[in-house]
Amino acid sequence: MIAELADVREDVPHADVAVVGAGFAGIDLAVQLGRRGLRVLLIEAGRDSFDPAAQDLARFSNVGKPLREPDPEGPHNPYLDRAFRGETRIRQFGGTSTIWTGKWRLLNPLTFQQREWVPGSGWPITREELLPFHAEVARDHGIGDVDALPDGGRHHPLAQECTAAGIDSSLLHWQASPLRMAERYRDELRAMPNVQVLLGATATELVLDDAHRRVRTVVVRSLGGHRAELSADQVVLATGGLEPARLLLASDRQLPEGIGNAHGLVGRYFQDHPKTKRAVLRPSPALRRMADWLATDPLPRDQLLFGLSLEEQRRHRLLDHAVSVRPVFDYELDYPAADVVAVREALRNRSLRGLTRATLARAAAPRTLRQYVGQRVHRRRRGRVAHYATAIYLEQAPNPESRLRLGARRDALGMRELEIDWQLSPLDHESFGRLQGLLTDAFARAGLGELDFGPDELTLADAGDANHHIGATRMAARPEEGVVDRDCRVFGTDNLYIATASVFPTGECATPTFTIAALARRLSAHLLALRDDERAPALRAPGDQ
């Protein structure tokens, strides 16, 4: 059943599991649990189609390094409905899967390990524990053989040269038609008698029992003034990387510091992936012949990514990173490419620091602008490769001073809006500074070509973000170190869980969706085990007896 809160005239029945948020993780949880017979209540703030008033409830303020505003005319936006362009999180049935670009990538093994040079690193679960759930998700969504993904990047023509130079080549699978969770599962959810989907219902407060151990009710409100108190044995927050912390902090009537915040960690350790497109790769003859390996169209395809090997990262005490490269053909670009890219990224990130007057003058020349417009119009033609445009994605080190907190401004439902204080640490800056020279040398040794970071000093002040919101309710072995335990259960509670990238202790530089999906499947298995055995036996991986 799918209904709007405003249309519900009777009390909503008690559920086995209430899932707040109907995006990638929330819908997957509801489907998996519903198929096994659990009574599931799926609660979504948005409606079945895009509603600007509901979207406005997701507003936040930047008080630290600003999160960038996406380019509405960027290369991944034209296929989207115009209402979505420039949005990074969608309040609608289907969540942000509605605008997702379809990129799947595994986290590397080093991410899960405690690295002595990265304070706060290490996961309380292993990569091996999560891989069976990755495989299950990959099977269901046509991603291919998960076991082959780690080695798949080692079969290109320059693979041996890259390995010898200390460069790892990895794969990012890019779907031709990105998975839209609402489109795929709407009919199945509507037909399940044991699943109720409630739209237009924003969770504004979690009410605990007298012992402050269990969530007794989830208070939801609609923009039309309707209010309901919903109950379930187990409650899961699947509301993206920002909203779980907001709801925990806002639920402060019984616990002044908010739920799960006994150690003041809710909202702290917020991370994103700093990203820059300033570097240009002038390809070697061998790399020119690999243009079809590296082009980003047609889709689907497994896109190659380059980066220093895990051994080199450990040796040089670096944070993780990945370099994607795209062939730019000579008809596209015969003007000062690095200058135009530098100015474009600076404007997008609202910072002109690091740009010289000469760079600005070259980029603003009339001939340069005419040629830039021309290459945008004719971007899909083929010809001789002039160079490779790059995007460098960087891991952010865990940093307790990088945080989310409640601001003074309130939304239309009376909830305090988030303030995002995104802060990069000295380790982030030092790692990126060393990385540029090491990458340049390694690319040359591998025969890939000359990596040019431009004439101006490139720092993280010039970098934007990747819209990957990570870490604000981090997973840990102890409540003194995080907000949720290894089963994604909020410390200090018995029945409250979080299933978003906000539980990642670290997120390397990979797109987070694949890992979010795997964690949601793992949580499904845990909740099913709770139903089958009140003593909560050890978590079973798919296929285990």
PLM segments and residue spans:
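FAD cofactor-binding and catalytic pocket of flavoenzymes
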Residues: 81-87, 263-266, 273-416, 466-469, ...
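Glycine-rich loop(s) and the adjacent beta-strand/alpha-helix scaffold that form part
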Residues: 35, 46-56, 206, 219-294, ...
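Conserved redox-cofactor binding core of oxidoreductases
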Residues: 76, 80, 103, 116-210, ...
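N-terminal Rossmann-like FAD-binding beta1-loop-alpha1 element of flavoenzymes
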Residues: 15-42
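A glycine-rich dinucleotide-binding beta-alpha-beta segment and adjacent secondary-structure elements
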Residues: 198-211, 374-403, 413-507, 513
